[in-house]
Amino acid sequence: MISSLRGTVLSVSGQTLLLEVHGVGYGVSVTPRHALELRHGSEATVLTSLVVREDSLTLFGFPGPDELRAFELLCGVTGVGPKSALAVLEHLDPEAMAQAVAAEDDAAFRRVSGIGPKTAKLIVLQLAGKLFVTQPRTRSASSAASTVTADVVTALIGLGWSERVARTAVDDAAAAAAEQGLPADMPRLLRVALGMLGPQQPAGAPAAAQAADR
């Protein structure tokens, strides 16, 4: 089993990290929030969970033990697969997850794309008493990045796009900023996301794009 990897970041695209370890490149699935912390050419260490399927082997990577444990606990919940678990961690860090479970706040999980009311309730029920944060992370760049991406997604939804389309565009915009080493602030992400959506723009989007360019 591969429990961790340490090496050089060759690329970060969307939710895929390519990490070179002793000449071998490993493709690792990460959250967009985690991807924003990684830079091309830098050294990085990720804790990993290997998910084995009949036709595939997929590595999921995390910045710390709390994220890894939260991911594995989520994957143990009925109806939650690895991709859905990663989506939850994009919206809620382990500390926020623990607080939501303790408060029986299933609404916090319903906000995650792909998590319905029934699954959200199961998460709260099945994770009760299991989530403990051992290394609280300071709410610095990663937390700020998550807030910014959520705000941009909300803005795009308000302009008429579906949550799925909006989130995909923002994730791609955030990944592009990370690859170029540029700050992922709200004006930049909104401008780039609108540019990616292009011809799909609903009424009112062009004005928002002009506002973002100012």
UniProtKB/Swiss-Prot annotation:
Residues 144-214 are annotated as: Domain III. InterPro entries: DNA_helicase_Holl-junc_RuvA_I, Hlx-hairpin-Hlx_DNA-bd_motif, NA-bd_OB-fold, RuvA, RuvA_2-like, RuvA_C, RuvA_C_sf. Residues 1-63 are annotated as: Domain I. Residues 139-143 are annotated as: Flexible linker. Keywords: Cytoplasm, DNA damage, DNA recombination, DNA repair, DNA-binding. Homotetramer. Forms an RuvA(8)-RuvB(12)-Holliday junction (HJ) complex. HJ DNA is sandwiched between 2 RuvA tetramers; dsDNA enters through RuvA and exits via RuvB. An RuvB hexamer assembles on each DNA strand where it exits the tetramer. Each RuvB hexamer is contacted by two RuvA subunits (via domain III) on 2 adjacent RuvB subunits; this complex drives branch migration. In the full resolvosome a probable DNA-RuvA(4)-RuvB(12)-RuvC(2) complex forms which resolves the HJ. HAMAP family: DNA_HJ_migration_RuvA (MF_00031). This is Holliday junction branch migration complex subunit RuvA. The lineage of its organism: Bacteria, Bacillati, Actinomycetota, Actinomycetes, Micrococcales. The gene is ruvA.
